[in-house]
Amino acid sequence: MGISLRLAEQFSAEEDGGGGGGNLVFSPLSIYSALSVVTAGARGTTLTELLAALGAPSRDALAKNAAEIARALAGGTATGGPRVAHACGLWHERTRSLKLAFRDAAAASFNAATRAVDFLANPEEARKEINSWVAAATENLIDTILPPGSVSTDTGLVVTSAIYFNGTWQTPFRKQDTKKDKFHLLDGHGTVDADFMRTGEDQYIAAHDGFKVLKMPYAHDHAAPQPSPRYYSMYILLPDERDGLSSLEDRMAAAGGGGGGEGFLSEHMPVRRVEVGEFRIPRFKLSFSRSVVRALRGVGVNAVFDRAELPDMIEGEPLRVSDVLHKAVIEVNEEGTEAAAATAVLMEGAARYAPPPPPREDFVADHPFAFFVVEESSGAVLFAGHVVDPTKS
């Protein structure tokens, strides 16, 4: 999903007039899934721009990758892993049928459910129905994705993508060890008192030039029968410098020749546990809610909003995308992580060698850092963001 880090860069640039001064959480996977469904009905420049942003050479390759991610994300609860639910929906005006090839492609690659609603006569009721679907898909962490007035009698189709994640750490932190400490804000703006989780257990840590990476695996039952392993981890990328977050994120986004920087993450992942010295990371709870059109334009997606070529989606007048709305929430604490996200695309007319033990590593996340929640086998980035003030949501 090459779009992940380039979107993070765009969102950061939007904060504080380009100062990047706010916390951030979003779901690359939710946005990727929703845009992939739109791509299944696109042609011409619209198709070219969407494929480039999503990092796919063709529509078939994109559909194949989406199907592989869907298989990798099949709920892990039965195998002792995190609970993961991912769903897509197509909500079309009931007087306009979806084209059969588009409907079948969306169902085959994205498991997208199709529902006919009455945008023309009762757009408010349709909005409530879509919001109820999102609330159910996200365990009510996100109770609404479409605000009042977002759909109208002109709405022809809404594409939704929702994800829910709930995982416990492989080694949970002890609550009694959590204590207040200073977290340093950006640009010398002082400190805040934050709740820091602590442990003396060995950790997956890798030290690189200018930053460190911490991997925190989620619990998984290795003995449980399953067709393929599903492993989830959170990665925290901590710059050495207290004000180093922006340059680190620029470095990540630039990696891979515009491919989005996921290669940067995979190349710097820790591979073994090391003894820790001083270790503490803050608890945090973040949320995000906005239109992501500006960010998508920033990564080269323009035609779909202007002269959209989307003739393969629905009968009658071709559509254009009028808005893309995204919401995300995440909470990280001693037990693990609970997170959810939803995206709505609104469209209307128009081992034998044993090396010596590595040195002991400190990992003190007392200044701004980036984080990712990743499914290891597919590399899918479920959630991404950064923390600049863990006391604010």
Curated annotation (Swiss-Prot):
UniProt keyword annotations, A-Z: Protease inhibitor, Serine protease inhibitor
Map out region (RCL) in residue numbers. 336-360
Q: Which InterPro entries match?
A: Serpin_dom, Serpin_fam, Serpin_sf, Serpin_sf_1, Serpin_sf_2
- The annotated site for Reactive bond falls at A350, A351
Q: Which SUPFAM superfamilies match?
A: Serpins (SSF56574)
Domain of life, source organism: Eukaryota
Query: Can you quote a single GO CC term?
Result: extracellular space
Q: Which SMART domains match?
A: SERPIN
- Entry keyword rRNA-binding: no
- Provide the GO MF annotations for this entry: serine-type endopeptidase inhibitor activity
The record's family statement is: Belongs to the serpin family.
- UniProt remark on domains: The reactive center loop (RCL) extends out from the body of the protein and directs binding to the target protease. The protease cleaves the serpin at the reactive site within the RCL, establishing a covalent linkage between the carboxyl group of the serpin reactive site and the serine hydroxyl of the protease. The resulting inactive serpin-protease complex is highly stable.
Task: Provide the function of this protein.
Answer: Probable serine protease inhibitor.
What name does this protein carry? Putative serpin-Z6A
* Species this chain originates from: Oryza sativa subsp. japonica (Rice)
